[in-house]
C-alpha cells in the first residue's frame, strides 16, 4: 500500500491531452461565438430581403390600389340591414305600422288585410333600397295601431 503518490509523468498524462494553455481555450470559444453571431446576422439579412419586396410605380398606377375609406363605408351601409320579403309581414309589423303612420298618414287598424299586404309590399321595396330612416332598421318596439286615443289611467 505504500505509494499513493503519482509520479510527475503520470500527472501530466491525466491533466490535458493537448499542450495548449487556458488562454488558448478562451480565445477559441470567443471566436466561435463571433462566428455564430455573424452567421445569425447573415440569416436575418437574407430573411429581411425576402420579406420586403418593393413594388414598382407602374404596378401602383395600374389600378392595383387598396380600397379607400369611402369605399369601405359604402360597403358597410349596404350590409347594415337584412333584405325583406313579403313573408316578413308579421316579423316587421311594428316597423310597418310606424311607416304607415309617418309616410302614408294611415293607421294599421283602418286597413283591410288585402290593402295592408299591398302597402307592405311598398314598404319592403323602400326597406330593401335602404331609403328608410335608421330607426326602422334598428327596430321599433311598438307601433301606432289605431287613431283612437286610449285613456288608460295608472
UniProtKB/Swiss-Prot annotation:
Record carries keyword Nucleus: yes
Annotated membrane-spanning segments are none
- UniProt key word Cell division: yes
* Bias type Basic residues, positions: 63-77
**Cellular component per GO?**
nucleus
Q: Which UniProt keywords apply?
A: Auxin signaling pathway, Cell cycle, Cell division, Developmental protein, Nucleus
Q: Which PANTHER family match?
A: STYLE CELL-CYCLE INHIBITOR 1
Q: What is this protein called?
A: Style cell-cycle inhibitor 1-A
